[in-house]
A protein has these predicted regions:
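Structured, active/binding-site neighborhoods that engage oxygen-rich ligands
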Residues: 1-372
Length: 372
């Protein structure tokens, strides 16, 4: 594994995150609240007056920097997961444990620390649902943290969770794969350990699949090999397993990622539920588009962004896989410059984190190969 592939993974995920239309909404959280309220009012005006001019996030008399192209929540939660890998790579901390146990201990400590912040916020609020948290997170993550704060432990924190099926852990799994390059099973096991804090069912299966695929992409495997490893983690009898196999069949009949978009839109993407973040949709879409794009990020990410229902995370998942496959050299310089720095819109403590520097740190934690 080379630093360039880790860098490609992180920058690819960030570029995909930035490419999806929800990114601007997430980044708008750094604007004054009244700007978001005004956007909602303009949307209501358009609905009531039957106008087809739809509002977008606005700055008006405020500095517009938060609304410019850049990564948002997915990239920040991937960096959150990467921090555990960094802690486990420090042999001076918990040095009496194996690296695998250190990594799991680091993950647990990370979640426990955030849950403590949730508990403190809950104590200041009349009820936990109204607590003002020092972060922004998916429903599954917020519920999982609430469960931890209430004294539950995994797998209950992920099982007793209204959004156990979403893909929050799939995003984190992409970064966790760095811990086990070339070893899809151990990468998947680590991703499941983390996923159980917030997910169950397809949410866990999807995390295992993404970790397995990324573990092989980081050592230069072909896209078909990576996708095959992902499929082994998706049971046939599950919705995510059925969707993934069908999506890949569709990819095999398509001439390009662009040609695949309508097929995925009509046969894989759900149009009933309120949120487009089900792992059973976004992971199959990412795997299929990476395959149809032949591992090329410049084709996979724009195609994923075209699927508006799943644009909150499918482009990031596709970008992580194809970014690792092609390495950092496949990320255009313009995208690299726009996406390398986190804004802190979801995790304020990660504001100004440089993903290129994070890739260097992750590479430095890798154990020495036998023979030097």
């Amino acid at each position: 594994m080379t630093r360039r592939r880790i860098e490609g993974l992180l920058l690819g995920l960030a570029a995909g995150d930035a490419a999806g239309w929800p990114s601007a909404r997430h980044r708008a959280s750094r604007m004054p609240e009244w700007t978001r309220r005004l956007t909602r009012e303009l949307d209501t005006f358009a609905e009531h007056n039957a106008t087809t001019t739809l509002p977008v996030p606005i700055a008006l008399n405020q500095p517009p920097e938060p609304l410019r192209l850049g990564p948002s929540d997915d990239a920040e939660w991937a960096a959150f997961a990467a921090e555990a890998v960094l802690r486990a790579g420090d042999d001076t901390v918990l040095g009496d444990l194996s690296r695998e146990l250190r990594t799991r201990a680091a993950i647990d400590l990370t979640w426990t620390a955030v849950a403590s912040e949730v508990a403190a916020a809950a104590e200041r609020a009349p009820e936990i649902e109204s607590a003002v948290l020092p972060l922004r997170a998916r429903i599954s993550v917020r519920a999982g943290l609430g469960n931890l704060a209430a004294g539950l432990r995994p797998p209950a924190t992920g099982h007793d969770n209204p959004h156990y099926f979403d893909d929050a852990a799939c995003i984190r799994a992409c970064a966790l794969a760095v811990a086990y390059p070339g070893d899809p099973r151990r990468a998947a096991d680590l991703a499941e350990f983390d996923a159980r804090y917030t997910q169950d069912g397809d949410g866990v299966h999807g995390a295992r699949a993404m970790a397995a695929a990324l573990a092989l992409a980081l050592v230069g495997a072909e896209v078909e090999t990576c996708v095959a490893a992902a499929l082994t983690e998706l049971p046939d009898a599950t919705e995510i397993g059925r969707n993934a196999r069908h999506a890949l069949t569709l990819a095999g009949t398509s001439d390009s990622a662009f040609a695949l978009i309508p097929l995925l839109e009509h046969q894989i993407v759900d149009h009933v539920y309120s949120y487009g973040i089900a792992a059973a949709e976004t992971v199959p879409v990412a795997l299929a588009l990476a395959t149809a794009a032949r591992g090329r990020i410049a084709e996979a990410v724009p195609a994923a962004a075209c699927l508006s229902r799943v644009a909150d995370s499918a482009p990031a998942l596709a970008g992580a896989l194809t970014g690792a496959l092609g390495g950092a050299e496949e990320i255009p310089e313009s995208w690299r410059d726009a996406c390398r720095t986190l804004s802190g819109c979801a995790l304020p403590r990660l504001t100004d984190t440089d993903l290129v520097e994070l890739a260097e740190l992750l590479e430095a934690t890798q154990p020495a190969r036998p023979g030097g």
